[in-house]
Amino acid sequence: MKKCAWLLTALFLLAGCTREEPARIWTPSPASPTPSAAVSPEPESAWWEGLVEKDLPTGLASPDQLGALGEEEVLLLGRTAVTSLYVLGGDSGILLLRNGRLSHFGQQFSPKDSLSLPELYQWDYDGDGLDELAVRYLMEAEGDQIVYDLHIYDWSDETCTDLPVTRDACADRALAAVTSDYDPGSGTLTLSYGDTSAVYRFPEQYRQSPGRMSFATSFFREQNGVFTVILGARAESTGAWFANVLADIEYDGADFTLRNLRVEPTTVV
């Protein structure tokens, strides 16, 4: 009994000498600082955006100036009684000035390629009682391939719009309207619309593979407020121009339609 009592006493003493571990208290680790959102740099303004009317030239550009247009230069291409047309260097588009208000369009026109001033026409083309500005641009002149584009600029109270009546846009609509028939036996291609037509006979060596036909040239003729587009039809394999497709441009204030379409031959079979 004494031995057991001594053992119990020793156990109690040991228990009393043992230190209690302090309770562990959870503390969150310091939060990593949130990175500040990257601030995008403000886009740089285009060199021409600060231009005002007094900064613009008043004299028409000469052919020499057209050929030497600088990257940050403005040239006056033409004017009517109320509108002036400018080209911006560095392929930056054009500016229109009307009643003290500038309108910018990013259309590509390189006077270095044509060395020709555009021609400006002021007329009420859509019949709304207000004049629009139509501009005929020479876009390409290489050998017998000459391409003009027409742009119609229309002003409302707040905005100015540009309707491009280009060679490609007119060609797409004309191709959808005309009929082309090829006879491999005789090697003849007939291009027709209504009761108008033109016929081209391919040389013998091309008859099995005549290739494509395209409208490769364009010109816009103006008379009494009506523009007529003249598209030159060419056989790609031989390079022969064999027909013109003509159509009047009807502008409705938003888009254009080809009216009075006809085919005229330019070669004799």
Language-model segments: residues:
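Beta-propeller blade termini
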Residues: 59-77, 117-125, 215-222
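Acidic/hydrophobic-patterned starts of short beta strands in beta-sheet-rich repeat architectures
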Residues: 75, 127-137, 223-230
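C-terminal motif of bacterial Sec signal peptides marking the signal peptidase cleavage site
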Residues: 14-16
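Positively charged n-region of N-terminal signal peptides that target proteins for export
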Residues: 1-5
